[in-house]
Amino acid sequence: MGDFNLVGVIRVMPTDPEVNLDELEEKLKALIPEKYGLAKVEREPIAFGLVALKFYVLGRDEEGYSFDEIAEKFQEVEEVESAEVETVSRI
């Protein structure tokens, strides 16, 4: 997985349960800049059929890497209600 030393978990809430999660996941993956890595994407059931997507994004502890920047890009997508960085951990 390269020389990444951080993993940031970004939780994305779709606008409603009818959103196609497969399409949304692919759309969001395309927004992650190339210098980052993607370890995995998980689906987290919330309530009333709503499912959040959790992106485990790999980065480095150095200038130029910002998980908040990725969350902001995710937030600009029409089907996204919210996107926030839940945690950032060393790996």
Curated annotation (Swiss-Prot):
Keyword Lyase: no
Similarity comment text for this entry: Belongs to the EF-1-beta/EF-1-delta family.
Entry-linked PANTHER family: ELONGATION FACTOR 1-BETA (PTHR39647:SF1)
Family matches, as Pfam families: EF1_GNE
HAMAP family associated with the record: EF1_beta (MF_00043)
UniProt lineage: Archaea, Methanobacteriati, Methanobacteriota, Thermococci, Thermococcales
GO MF annotation list: translation elongation factor activity
Keyword Protein biosynthesis: yes
Protein name: Elongation factor 1-beta
Organism whose genome encodes this protein: Pyrococcus furiosus (strain ATCC 43587 / DSM 3638 / JCM 8422 / Vc1)
CDD domains, alphabetized: EF1B
Superkingdom of the organism of origin: Archaea
InterPro entries: eEF-1beta-like_sf (IPR036219), EF1B_bsu/dsu_GNE (IPR014038), Transl_elong_EF1B/ribsomal_bS6 (IPR014717), Transl_elong_EF1B_B_arc (IPR004542)
SMART domains for this protein: EF1_GNE
Keywords: Elongation factor, Protein biosynthesis
Biological role stated in the UniProt entry: Promotes the exchange of GDP for GTP in EF-1-alpha/GDP, thus allowing the regeneration of EF-1-alpha/GTP that could then be used to form the ternary complex EF-1-alpha/GTP/AAtRNA.
